[in-house]
Amino acid sequence: QRQMCIETGAAFPDRKIHLFDTFEGFSEKDITIEASGNLSRAKTGDFSSTDIDSVLHVMPDPTRTVIHKGWFPDTFSDVTDETFCFVSLDADLYAPTAAALPLFYERLATGGVLLIHDVYSTQFSGCRKAVGEFCLKNHLFADPVCDLHGSAMIENYKKKRRNRYLPEPAFLF
């Protein structure tokens, strides 16, 4: 994640970077959903070791970093007027991923990219389920990314001219 912060800051040197995190790990509510669907072995509080100061310390320019602490999507109300050119979504679990996808995609600039971590991860199949449902509902395609996290990316095709010879986008299962 440190390297991702550095590279994102370098790629967008003149933009604000919004970071959404609970800084408390996974919630009991989300873990209950994961367990009922046999989607992961995650536990309440996993990933709770992240703190705001350590995150700001690795950001190339902390003055351009906006922290949104709390449970997603509740914290999204702070940015309803924003348009995003790049979103890196690493929610891991089904419920927060399913809640985040439509909110961010709706505000993604034309040609913007939504990068979702753990889509092809064997550790968090709830993320894959959420992305699959979102792509099928919206006729989108999640392109696999060759990384260690099983990531995929969705490009915003709104208003963008599509090649009429390409097949309709879908999600790879």
How does the language model describe each region?
Residues 158-172:
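Positively charged N-terminal leader segments that act as targeting/secretion signals
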Residues 17-20:
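Conserved SAM-binding motif I beta-strand of class I
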Residues 15, 60-66, 138-140:
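A short helix-to-beta-strand connector/capping loop
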Residues 65-124:
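Active-site segment flanking the S-adenosylmethionine/decSAM binding pocket
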Residues 31-80:
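S-adenosyl-L-methionine
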Residues 128-147:
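Conserved Class I S-adenosyl-L-methionine
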Residues 1-5:
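Short, small-residue-biased leader/transition segments that mark boundaries at the very start
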Residues 24-31:
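A short beta-to-alpha transition loop/helix N-cap that caps and shapes the active-site region
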